[in-house]
Amino acid sequence: DFTGADLANADLRGSKFTAKIGSYDEEGEATIDFTEANLAHADLSGSKLKAEAERGNAVIDFTKATLAHADLSDSKLRADGGWYATIDFNEANLAHADLSGSEVTTDGKHGATTATIGFKKANLANADLSGSELEAEGMEATIDFVEANLAHVDLSGSVLSADTAYNGATVDFTEANLANADLSGSWITAESRKGDTTIDFAKANL
């Protein structure tokens, strides 16, 4: 638990963070928690963060964290949940952060699972997400950039994919600021075998 921790300028290159509930008979939540942590200018390049819960919730949480100028290039963040799989950057400050080549994956394995990657109201101004892969897969899947600041963000060559078996698949940029954003060569897809599919730029600043 790194909630509220001061990790500004920390050298965490190639580090591994793992939270696991391994038995299918074991319920609960596997959480890696950086809520409101200060990671400004921290180096997490090449790091691996994995939360796994076969019968519970898997969460990697950076809600309201400060990641301005942080280096997460080539990092891998993965949440595998039996019920909910969530990677959350809601309201985080990622201005000028480097996430190039990173992989952010949420996978709901069993039951009525929900897979979510959340950047709601996050500040990603001037961030580099070029060549990154954001993939949410479950019975319901959402990639959420609602009201996010993506001014001057580099999403070139990136892949944003929401994939579901039965329920809704959504990639949501509602009211996001994408002024001068670079989406060249990017792929944004929402796929569902039976449910609704939505890619939403309603009221976004393009």
Positions of PLM-derived features:
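Tandem repeat scaffolds
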Residues: 1-206
